[in-house]
UniProtKB/Swiss-Prot annotation:
Entry-linked PANTHER family: GLUCOSAMINE-6-PHOSPHATE ISOMERASE (PTHR11280:SF5)
Site (Part of the allosteric site): 151, 158, 160-161, 254
Recorded superkingdom: Bacteria
Name of protein: Glucosamine-6-phosphate deaminase
Assembly and binders: Homohexamer.
Record EC number: 3.5.99.6
UniProt KW ATP-binding keyword: no
Species name: Klebsiella pneumoniae subsp. pneumoniae (strain ATCC 700721 / MGH 78578)
Catalytic activity: alpha-D-glucosamine 6-phosphate + H2O = beta-D-fructose 6-phosphate + NH4(+)
Family: Belongs to the glucosamine/galactosamine-6-phosphate isomerase family. NagB subfamily.
GO cellular component labels: cytoplasm
Enzymatic class: hydrolase
UniProt GO BP: carbohydrate metabolic process; glucosamine catabolic process; N-acetylglucosamine catabolic process; N-acetylneuraminate catabolic process
UniProt keyword Hydrolase, yes or no: yes
Length: 266
């Protein structure tokens, strides 16, 4: 596992965007051989999306031959709702780059048959072979996507009940009213995530410090979903300074020395 210890949220977003752009450009995607990118929503990736849009406008990257799969979507929220993840992605990213509409894949939280929708999503991912890079965030309790504590580390795309803590955290997007936050969501599974060629998780803020400590210094544990990264051959965590407050000094020193060349120029 790689840990990229930075200082600010803006630096985390810039590093993540630069990493994605480098991966896409090195892949040299074509219409017949697209780069497959997994994407998250929420507050954490906003700086990364902003940086990606800026790099696209500067001519440094094209998304014309990129196929995307989003991590999750609320159940029962109309896709036109401003807080649906469909709306979020278009507002913050898709509407500002050159990705074709047919290359965008989002779960349908209003599908008449939820199980069939989850199977369809898994099959669509498999039809491309694999996701080349999956970017994600992490919750205070260590959840990735909506794989809440005690999620199976072999799980696939499915419906999940959201914990009260997650709904309270997400209520900031619903005028602070937890009752407006959906109780269920569709989410890719931990196994789906681990199937990706590379997984990059962004961690911001002191409230994520225990989750980061579990991921880097703890044992693999289904109560801390983020620890699944220890099982992945190519996992990278990009974090800001406040999120590292629970890490041992020697752990942080080790990764700072290891990644010194990779964190220059931010």
């Amino acid at each position: 596992m790689r840990l990229i210890p930075l200082v600010t949220a803006e630096q985390v977003g810039k590093w993540a965007a630069r990493h994605i752009v480098n991966r896409i450009n090195a892949f040299k995607p074509t219409a017949d051989r697209p780069f497959v990118l997994g994407l998250p929503t929420g507050g954490t990736p906003l700086t990364a999306y902003k940086a990606l849009v800026e790099m696209h406008k500067a001519g440094q990257v094209s998304f014309k031959h990129v196929v995307t799969f989003n991590m999750d979507e609320y159940v029962g929220l109309p896709k036109e709702h401003p807080e649906s993840y469909h709306s979020f992605m278009h507002r913050n990213f898709f509407d500002h780059v050159d990705i074709p509409a047919e290359n965008i894949n989002l779960l349908n939280g209003n599908a008449p048959d939820i199980d069939a929708e989850c199977r369809r999503y898994e099959e669509k991912i498999r039809s491309y072979g694999k996701i080349h890079l999956f970017m994600g965030g992490v919750g205070n309790d260590g959840h990735i996507a909506f794989n809440e504590p005690a999620s199976s580390l072999a799980s696939r795309t499915r419906i999940k009940t959201l914990t009260h803590e997650t709904r309270v955290a997400n209520s900031r997007f619903f005028d602070g009213d937890v009752d407006l936050v959906p109780k269920y969501a569709l989410t890719v599974g931990v196994g789906t995530l681990l199937d990706a060629e590379e997984v990059m998780i962004l961690v911001l803020g002191h409230q994520k410090a225990l989750a980061l400590q579990a991921a880097v210094e703890g044992n693999v544990n289904h109560m801390w979903t983020i620890t699944c990264l220890q099982l992945h051959p190519k996992a990278v965590i990009v974090c800001d300074e406040p999120s590292t407050m629970e890490l041992k000094v020697k752990t942080l020193k080790y990764f700072n020395e290891l990644e010194a060349e990779n964190i220059k120029g931010l």
